[in-house]
Amino acid sequence: MTAQIIIAVPKGRILKEVLPLFAALGIVPEPAFGDEDSRLLRFATNRSDIGLIRVRAFDVATFVAHGAAQLGIVGSDVLMEFDYSELYAPVDLAIGHCRISVAEPVAMAAGDDPREWSHVRVATKYPNITRRHFEARGVQAECVKLNGAMEIAPVLGLSSRIVDLVSTGRTLKDNGLAEVETIAEVSSRLIVNRAAFKTRAGEIGPLVEGFRRAVEDKNAA
């Protein structure tokens, strides 16, 4: 019996944008998949050859890179941070739009010019992206790795600035921070394990093309 194709999907709000793409491919997950409060990690679909797992965004790339899942949906921020050679990202799904930005306290931003920075201490869950960004400008970046609650770091003196994902900017504003620089625009991508794409091309190839057509049809609508 041929093993299932496993598609890894990140937890959170992106689920609502993923479901229409699955529907366009004729993939219908079990009801619990759309429930953000469900503690299940693995889900069945209407197709016996396709299963889903729902994990943290950073873990999607790891599961696919190591072959535990054959396909995944993940933000381009994760691909920029980890740069796995085992991953192929053939389709920009045009969902999950946001940006990676530098932010600092509003009072500091009022008289600050990023072009004059020579050294920064930054709290972030993206140390690799942050270092590369500042190194390219000749700025020394000291990164404090956090997995969440970045916005409170400047308040408590852990760092003077943060680098984080920004969507509406509401969370920054609520915590007295101002966005001062955009590092990169972010959207969700379909990723594929390179080895699986070669060995199971007959199964994976049509799925990749299905996602591509779904995005094209959505953009044309």
UniProtKB/Swiss-Prot annotation:
InterPro entries: ATP_PRibTrfase_cat, ATP_PRibTrfase_CS, ATP_PRibTrfase_HisG, ATP_PRibTrfase_HisG_short. It is found in: Cytoplasm. GO terms for biological process: L-histidine biosynthetic process. Keywords: Amino-acid biosynthesis, ATP-binding, Cytoplasm, Glycosyltransferase, Histidine biosynthesis, Nucleotide-binding, Transferase. GO terms for molecular function: ATP binding; ATP phosphoribosyltransferase activity. CDD domains: PBP2_HisGs. Pfam families: HisG. It is an enzyme of class 2 (transferase). Pathway: Amino-acid biosynthesis; L-histidine biosynthesis; L-histidine from 5-phospho-alpha-D-ribose 1-diphosphate: step 1/9. It catalyses: 1-(5-phospho-beta-D-ribosyl)-ATP + diphosphate = 5-phospho-alpha-D-ribose 1-diphosphate + ATP. It comes from the Bacteria. Its EC number is 2.4.2.17. Belongs to the ATP phosphoribosyltransferase family. Short subfamily. Heteromultimer composed of HisG and HisZ subunits. PANTHER family: ATP PHOSPHORIBOSYLTRANSFERASE (PTHR21403:SF8), ATP PHOSPHORIBOSYLTRANSFERASE ATP-PRTASE (PTHR21403). HAMAP family: HisG_Short (MF_01018). Lacks the C-terminal regulatory region which is replaced by HisZ. This is ATP phosphoribosyltransferase. The gene is hisG.
